[in-house]
Amino acid sequence: MFRARINEILQKDGIHSVGFIAGGIKLRGVFLQLSSELKVGSEVYVGFKSTDVLLSREALSGVSSENEIHGKIMSLSLGEILCTLRFEGKISFDVLISAHSAQELALREGDEVLA
């Protein structure tokens, strides 16, 4: 989890699109429920599952993902099936991907990647 400030809230038919700023990075999330106490300018903690993160060596184009964070792999543990790593950039978090994906990307500690 990391701290962020809400900079935009769009709502239509009970669905909320929320813009955040965290560490100078603009992020966006879509939510089915949102507390009525949250407003533009509210400070919040943002969290997501470590399995919800995609990693790439290059900027992605032609995909529906809006969030892109530049950073570095600080630690990496490669198992037979899963790979856990620590991603650090302007915000930091843990990532869980398949060992096969980590090997295909030839990921190593110290590599710069996009999440």
Which residues does each PLM region occupy?
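Glycine/charge-rich catalytic "coupling/switch" loops of P-loop NTPases
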Residues: 3, 26, 33-75, 101-115
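Short, conserved beta-turn/loop elements at beta-strand boundaries and strand-helix junctions
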Residues: 9-15, 76-82
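A generic beta-sheet turn/junction motif
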Residues: 13, 22-24, 48, 80
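Short, acidic/hydrophobic/Gly-rich beta-strand patch recurrent on exposed beta strands
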Residues: 17-23, 30, 84-90, 95-96
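A short, compositionally biased micro-patch
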Residues: 79, 88-90, 100, 108
